[in-house]
Each structure stands twice: as structure tokens, then as C-alpha cells.
A protein has these predicted regions:
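Internal intein/HINT superfamily modules and their associated LAGLIDADG
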Residues: 1-347
Length: 347
């Protein structure tokens, strides 16, 4: 069953309908006590935990009050940003985790999934602990340390509210970054839903009277983490980008650009040759994307398959031109059937 959403129309009711329809079809929105939603099931699902870690490392933020600061104290929270068109994914993740709330910021063009109660922050931290791969793990460790301090500072409390919280949280092992092979879990799928894109480029060859269709998978992130390490040194994202490049058999590119009179530096990996495209398609066929980028990937894959079957560009050029009219930023139609029975809820 496909659920179609058109840009330019009121989006929220349709998106909500599509998600609830998928849920009810699978009989897992009827009873909030369904076992698949329990922490024990998610703890047994490496794909869910690694996907969520990648998504948070790409588009998520841990906000933790500095205990040495004199500013107003606040509870820790986790905020994940989505494109407005990815509201169904945000609602889907909120529903299966039962953590936080989803806020649609139509005037700003994005959606927030915000987790800020202590128990939910603990759950998310517990689930992704051991699955992160970037310098952002520092913020997870700060969150876990905050939880440990909360337990220590309140273990003798007689307040019912605090006792209830303490009954649902516990000390966590502070685990290091995951160093397993990239292809071993769904981390790259979550990270790509946050920071990657697919391209179908069509251009005329300068020295030939012909047209070329080029396909790219591209992932770009900033070069350094915003906090210094314990020795006051910058922490680079190069190690993880180098590992991704090794997996894809490509190189890491560095670039700088100026936005609003400020210079930004980033690392990029690009799949563009036959070997790297084969690698990335095998990966995403095993661990599918879950955002609307899944639709771009399927179109990208369709053209790649035509390209591999046909030596003449003219045999599939028309299809490539047609697809580009409803692709990436020009996309106007969406469906979310790929969330139905997806690997996040299978153990």
C-alpha cells in the first residue's frame, strides 16, 4: 500500500494518516504494552541500536548542563532534527521507542524529535551506547556521567517521583566507539539518512556529441568536533571518514566554503566508480535507508541497473531525465511503505 504526499499541500494530516495506517496494518499501535516496544527487545536489536546511533551522530545533539557552570540548571535532553518531509520517520521512531515528543516547525522547514525526561534520555543513551563511531561519543559519555551523578545524589531521596525515576534507570558501562566493520550493522544507514545524498548528473561531453549520465553517493561532514579533548586539542572526524572511504574503496576529500562570511571545513566521501557503487548498493539493500532518501536511493538504483545493462546512454537517458524531475530537492511525491515491517522492529 502506498501513501502519497504532495509538496505544497497541507502536509501534517496526510503524513499522520500514512504512519498510523502502516502501524494499524501491522497491529502494533493498538496496544502500547506490545512487547516489541520494550527496552529488552530493543537491547536485542543491533540494527535498531546502530541505526539510531548513526542518525544521532549525524543530526542529533546531546544537551547536558555543565555542573561547573553558574547558569540555570536544566535536565539533559537529546534533540534530533529531520527535514519537514521526514515527519513520518520522526513519528515512527518516537512511537516504537515511546520516548520524547515530535514537534513540527513548519515555518522553519524542519521537525524536531526531542527527548528530555530522565528515563527516556537514559533509554536512548543505553540503546546507542557501544554503537557510536564519531567524536560525538563525548557528548554521550557526558550524558551517562550526568545520569550516574543523578543516581548518586538522589539514592537516599524519599520523594515518590524521584524513587520512580531511580527504579527505571541504572549505572551504565561507558563504552568506547564501535570499531567493527562498517558493513556489520545499520550505523551507516542512520548516518546517511542524516548527512548523505544521491545524485543523478546529466551533462554533455565537451569533446563529443553525446550526453553522459553519472551516479554518485556522497556523504559530507564537518572536519572537527566542536569540543576540545582533555589535552585541549581539536578532535577530527577524519578517522571515521577514512574508514568509510576504505569501505567504499574511494578517497577522502577536504573542502572549505564560505557561508555568511564564515569559513567552514568539511570531509567528503563520494562513491562514483563501479566498485564503490557496488559496495554502497549492497550495503543499502541489506540495511535500507528509512527517511525519504530511501525513495531517492531506489530511483538512483534503478538508473544504475539500467546503466549496467545498457552500454548506450541513449537507451536510458529518457528515464534518467524523467526521474530527476521528482528526485532530491525536486521530489513532490512520497510514500512510507518501506517502514512497514522494517528491520528496526525485528529481533
Amino acid at each position: 500500500m502506498f501513501f502519497i504526499v504532495n509538496k505544497g499541500k497541507e502536509i501534517n494530516p496526510i503524513l499522520k494518516f500514512s504512519i498510523s495506517s502502516i502501524f494499524y496494518t501491522n497491529n502494533f499501535n493498538k496496544d502500547n504494552s506490545k512487547e516489541f516496544k520494550s527496552e529488552i527487545n530493543i537491547l536485542n536489536n543491533d540494527n535498531f541500536r546502530s541505526y539510531l546511533a548513526g542518525l544521532i551522530e549525524g543530526d542529533g545533539t546531546f544537551a547536558v548542563h555543565n555542573k561547573n557552570s553558574t547558569s540555570k540548571k536544566y535536565l539533559p535532553k537529546i534533540i534530533i532534527v529531520f527535514k519537514l518531509t521526514d515527519l513520518p520517520l520522526a513519528e515512527y521512531l518516537q512511537l516504537i521507542t515511546q520516548c520524547g515528543k515530535v514537534y513540527k516547525k513548519s515555518n522553519r522547514g524542519y521537525v524536531l524529535w526531542q527527548i528530555q525526561d530522565i528515563v527516556s534520555v537514559f533509554k536512548i543513551s543505553n540503546w546507542i551506547n557501544g554503537y557510536m563511531r564519531t567524536p560525538k561519543i563525548e557528548s554521550l559519555h557526558r550524558t551517562i556521567n550526568w545520569i550516574h551523578d543523578y543516581i548518586n545524589n538522589n539514592k537516599n531521596s524519599k520523594l515518590t517521583k524521584i524513587q520512580n525515576i531511580l527504579s527505571k534507570i541504572h549505572y551504565l558501562e561507558i563504552k568506547p566507539n564501535d570499531i567493527s566493520e562498517i558493513e556489520s550493522n545499520a550505523w551507516l544507514s542512520g548516518f546517511s539518512d542524516a548527512d548523505a545524498n544521491f545524485s543523478i548528473n546529466i551533462h554533455k561531453r565537451t569533446n563529443k556529441n553525446s550526453t553522459r549520465v553519472q551516479l554518485y553517493y556522497r556523504l559530507e561532514i564537518k572536519q572537527t568536533y566542536h569540543k576540545l579533548d582533555s589535552d585541549d586539542n581539536k578532535v577530527s572526524f577524519f578517522p571515521i571518514m577514512s574508514k568509510l572511504a576504505g569501505f567504499l574503496c574511494v578517497s577522502v576529500y577536504s573542502r572549505s566554503r564560505i557561508l555568511n562570511n564564515k569559513e567552514f571545513y568539511s570531509f567528503t566521501v563520494v562513491s562514483h566508480n563501479k566498485k564503490s557503487l557496488l559496495k554502497i548498493t549492497h550495503y543499502f539493500n541489506k540495511f535500507p535507508l528509512l527517511s525519504s532518501k530511501y525513495l531517492d536511493y531506489k530511483d538512483f538504483l534503478y538508473i544504475l541497473e539500467l546503466q549496467n545493462k545498457n552500454k548506450l546512454t541513449t537507451s536510458y537517458l529518457g528515464e534518467a531525465i524523467k526521474i530527476r524531475k521528482d528526485f532530491n530537492s525536486t521530489r513532490t511525491t512520497y510514500h512510507w511503505s518501506h517502514l512497514k515491517n522494517c528491520y528496526l522492529i525485528k529481533t
